């Protein structure tokens, strides 16, 4: 349970023997959300002993192969794991995600014993919130890439403050569901008097905010979207020396990624989506150095396949 971030893969373009394609799984009190699903994602999930059957929603950033070719394998496995899936699978992504998935299910004659709910995103037209419940929501944000591409914002809702039992007794609020109503942030009526949650509850606790941002070139609008986020997982495809190539392909350099999170005053930043040309650890360390030179006051780290981060107060701790 809890609020955890699992790094499923960290590479771009093609999987390497020690680095699968970029993918992140967020666990939140038993609900699992997978972001991107390139080739080999199921292998990485298996290595990390994460059940694909527990994935509630898969969010695809865009329809390039290195972010989507593992999707059909996950869809198939959910019907072949020996247990019947009890709830629908939600698949979200830019326009085309539904056609891609349904067409391949039909062509490959994939047996499926559960419902899939598709949420296709028409950028700047679809409602920003693509998932919401009592404790959290997921929003999309436009990115700047060679095809339609979105980033995802996982936002934990503020938690209500401590319930003041003594005050509740003073106001003759009976124990039971009516107190729960106040804890849910709703007013109640007692003896003809309206009682507001603020009269009974202490100061609320700010929810944590996590962003998954890949693939994109630099653009200012993104900065405001991730302002003051607790954790941003952002692409760092190239070294700074390849800025021209990065700009042409609409990707970010390490310095470019750091510049964005610096302006956004992000608390903690994980670099991801490393070019296949960087196979040595020292290459990745150089990416990190370039990012830290741009944002020396920032808490920046290299993501790694199999890494896990756990929420701790207003931060995420690498375990």
From Swiss-Prot:
It is an enzyme of class 3 (hydrolase). It catalyses: Endonucleolytic cleavage of RNA, removing extra 3' nucleotides from tRNA precursor, generating 3' termini of tRNAs. A 3'-hydroxy group is left at the tRNA terminus and a 5'-phosphoryl group is left at the trailer molecule. Binds 2 Zn(2+) ions. Its cofactor is Zn(2+). The active site is at 66 (proton acceptor). Zn(2+) 2 binds at residues 66-67, 215, 273. Disulfide bonds: none annotated. Its EC number is 3.1.26.11. It comes from the Bacteria. Zn(2+) 1 binds at residues 62, 64, 145, 215. Pfam families: Lactamase_B (PF00753), Lactamase_B_2 (PF12706). Keywords: Endonuclease, Hydrolase, Metal-binding, Nuclease, tRNA processing, Zinc. GO terms for molecular function: 3'-tRNA processing endoribonuclease activity; zinc ion binding. Homodimer. Zinc phosphodiesterase, which displays some tRNA 3'-processing endonuclease activity. Probably involved in tRNA maturation, by removing a 3'-trailer from precursor tRNA. Belongs to the RNase Z family. This is Ribonuclease Z. It comes from Borrelia garinii subsp. bavariensis (strain ATCC BAA-2496 / DSM 23469 / PBi). The lineage of its organism: Bacteria, Pseudomonadati, Spirochaetota, Spirochaetia, Spirochaetales.
């Amino acid at each position: 349970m809890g609020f955890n971030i699992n790094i499923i893969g960290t590479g771009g373009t093609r999987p390497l023997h020690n680095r699968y394609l970029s993918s992140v799984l967020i666990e939140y009190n038993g609900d699992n959300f997978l972001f991107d699903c390139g080739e080999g994602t199921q292998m990485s999930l298996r290595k990390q002993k994460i059940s694909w059957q527990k994935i509630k929603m898969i969010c695809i950033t865009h329809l390039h192969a290195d972010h989507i070719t593992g999707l059909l394998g996950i869809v198939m496995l959910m019907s072949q794991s020996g247990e019947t899936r009890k709830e629908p699978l939600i698949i979200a992504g830019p326009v085309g995600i539904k056609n891609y998935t349904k067409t391949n299910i039909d062509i490959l004659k994939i047996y499926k014993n559960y419902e899939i709910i598709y949420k296709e995103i028409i950028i700047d037209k679809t409602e920003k919130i693509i998932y919401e419940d009592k404790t959290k929501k997921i929003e999309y944000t436009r990115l700047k890439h060679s095809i339609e591409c979105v980033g995802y914002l996982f936002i934990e809702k503020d938690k209500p403050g401590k319930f003041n039992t003594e005050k509740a007794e003073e106001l003759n609020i009976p124990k039971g569901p009516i107190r729960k109503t106040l804890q849910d942030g709703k007013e109640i009526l007692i003896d003809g008097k309206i009682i507001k949650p603020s009269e009974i509850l202490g100061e609320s606790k700010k929810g944590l905010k996590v962003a998954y941002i890949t693939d994109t070139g630099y653009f200012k609008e993104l900065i405001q979207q991730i302002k003051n986020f607790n954790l941003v997982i952002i692409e760092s495809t190239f070294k700074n020396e390849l800025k021209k190539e990065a700009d042409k392909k609409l990707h970010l350099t390490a310095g470019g990624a750091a510049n964005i999170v610096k302006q956004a005053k992000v608390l903690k930043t994980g670099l991801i989506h490393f070019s296949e040309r960087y196979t040595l650890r020292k290459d990745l360390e150089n990416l990190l150095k370039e990012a830290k030179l741009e944002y020396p006051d920032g808490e920046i780290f290299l993501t790694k396949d199999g890494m896990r981060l756990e929420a701790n107060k207003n931060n995420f701790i690498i375990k």
